[in-house]
Amino acid sequence: MQPAAPQTLNLDLVGRTLEAPEFTYDWKTCATYALGIGAGPEELAYLWEGTPGFHVYPGFAVVPVQGIVMDALARIGADFRTLVHGEQTLRLHRPFDRAGVLRSTGRVSAVHDKGKAAVVVIDTTTHDANGQLVAETTWSIFCRGQGGFGGEPGPSPVAVQPLPDAPPAFTAQFATQSTQALLYRLSGDLNPLHVDPALATRVGFEAPILHGLCSYGFAARALVLHLGGGDPARLRSFSARFSGVVYPGTIVDLVARPTDVAGRFAVEARVGDRLVLSHGVAELA
């Protein structure tokens, strides 16, 4: 039997705004996310509701918009069996409150033709109940086998260069737990690839893999702790490319290096010698 032909993408969706249902959350939602990205007892400001000035890690920005991103991909005709999360960006305009109601919109801003694959770029904005802009995110999703439709290839990622010979701003090593993907999925990313051993093996992995956004959240958390003095409001933006797979239970080495722009850092992460986050750029106040 011949495999089914890839579905044609609905390019008419490009530029259209999609509304997400209101997202109601409380401190437990935020603490669950913090645990999913490795927070421990020394970070009670992110975990214990009794802490004065309870904090929320900036990576939480992806949580209220996961549904609208999946909806956009479904409407455009992406084949969910072949999706690969390529890049992620967040821009934080104000810290998340410990509880509240969030209203988000999404928009497919571009579809790039990479030949064998298409890259769907989705932008989201999130406002609080008072209408104040809290966060924006950009998701770049590779749709393997759905390129070749005659579109523009789009830009190629360019790595921000660190200052030559400058010492790192910081290095950090974080040990993911064997249960890390099981914890992270409680924040709403329920892709069975991260929990089902049979599925993971069937698509070519040794075991269920860690969510890319979990590794991204670990990195954003480290930036807040090491460069932001533990203040989430100081991380203004963070973008990174997912360059390799992380398995739960492995150790990840992160490095941030200064650039020629004050407050801007080049970021990458490795498992051993293997790059897993690349083209990282963080901006802090």
Task: Provide a role label for each language-model segment.
Residues 2-13, 83-172, 246-249, 253-285:
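HotDog/MaoC-like acyl-thioester-processing domains
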Residues 91, 204, 241:
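Conserved beta-strand segments that form the floor/walls of ligand-binding pockets within enzyme
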Residues 16-26, 166-179:
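Short amphipathic
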Residues 44-63, 172, 179-230, 234:
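A conserved, well-ordered hydrophobic junction motif at loop->secondary-structure transitions
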Residues 18, 101-105, 212, 216:
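Short Pro-Gly-centered flexible turn/kink motifs
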Residues 1-101, 227:
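Hydrophobic, proline/glycine-rich low-complexity stretches
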Residues 223-258:
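A conserved acidic, glycine/proline-rich C-terminal tail/linker
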